[in-house]
Amino acid sequence: MFVIEAVKSDVDANIQHKINQKTKPLGALGQLESLALQIARVQYRGDKQSLSTPLQITKPTMLVFAADHGIAAYGVSIAPSEVTTQMVHNFVQGGAAINVFCRQVGFELEIIDCGILQPLTGQANVIDQRLGAGTKAMHLAAAMPLEKVAQGFEFARQLVARHIDVGCNLIALGEMGIGNTSAATAVMSAMLNIDVEQCVGRGTGIDDATLVIKTKLINQALDLHQHELVSPEAILAHVGGFEIVQMTGAILAAAEQKILVVIDGFIATAAALVAVKLSPQSRDYLVFAHESQEQGHKLLLQQLQATPLLSLGLRLGEGTGAALALPLIQAAVNFYNQMASFDDAGVNNVV
């Protein structure tokens, strides 16, 4: 499994003092200050002399995990499962929102096939980490065998290690999969032991009648498996998705290696919830990009004591919110590294 250390807090006062001594009123950079503190804590390696080392973001990488869901065949979405493969093809061609935003902000983009129904053939730039051809319909059977969760975690560990080996110290998580808001809703409901109705949202933009069907089937799934939902891994196996499994594994793998993870929207945050339940220490490494319009996302963020960087009304997924957050993360790094202190600038200290 994953061995994750909490970030060291013994130098928090030193880091905060450095932030406070920048040429600004106390706290005037708002959330960027807490973000800089978090990044500095993550990148601190135990030697107090290293506090003078500039923070840095190197080779930031967006990982988009794609998979299909058996429940999608039962009327929970306005889009058929074929759209998953079509959108993965769009990613490969560079035409999706995530491609545009990654190019704009400087993210390397990698697409991972975790188990779409119709895999693309001959695409070297789609990473094959397939756990199957879509999950089973979770209201009729377990979404996947338990061993697929362990396999997905190992795939994710290897993926993250490969990027760290070439100098990446920040990953962001996105996803694509018709039906995955249903899986994320079920995971959230089971993990937090709260009603589906508090978690479920409109996903691709479903109408009221479809929302009723979606809610009913998720409740059926949770009722069917209620005696088996005994651990985070079991919850993933019975009502999760292949991409949610691998995002969870990627979070844990990145935290184990002490690098930052930028969490996108509702689906990625559901994976973050599972990761934090498995390893509370992993929470230290997570930056939450935005609050989406999915009903359950705000509650998920509250449960994780997360203040997102953005609130733009997004509900696209793909990692789009995480991509848009990268300039803010870089801004936090840059002010920490480059902004003058009161002493340096010869400015009266107003702190």
From Swiss-Prot:
| Cited InterPro entries | Nict_dMeBzImd_PRibTrfase, Nict_dMeBzImd_PRibTrfase_bact, Nict_dMeBzImd_PRibTrfase_N, Nict_dMeBzImd_PRibTrfase_sf
Q: Can the keyword Magnesium be found in this entry's annotation?
A: no
Output the Gene Ontology terms for molecular function.
nicotinate-nucleotide-dimethylbenzimidazole phosphoribosyltransferase activity
Report the transmembrane regions from the record.
none
The family database entries (Pfam families) matched by this protein are listed as: DBI_PRT
Q: Which residues form the active site?
A: 318
Q: Tell me which UniProt keywords the record has, alphabetically.
A: Cobalamin biosynthesis, Glycosyltransferase, Transferase
- Family membership, please give it: Belongs to the CobT family.
- The protein's role, per its UniProt record: Catalyzes the synthesis of alpha-ribazole-5'-phosphate from nicotinate mononucleotide (NAMN) and 5,6-dimethylbenzimidazole (DMB).
Q: What is this protein called?
A: Nicotinate-nucleotide--dimethylbenzimidazole phosphoribosyltransferase
Q: What organism does the record attribute this protein to?
A: Shewanella frigidimarina (strain NCIMB 400)
Gene name, per UniProt, is cobT
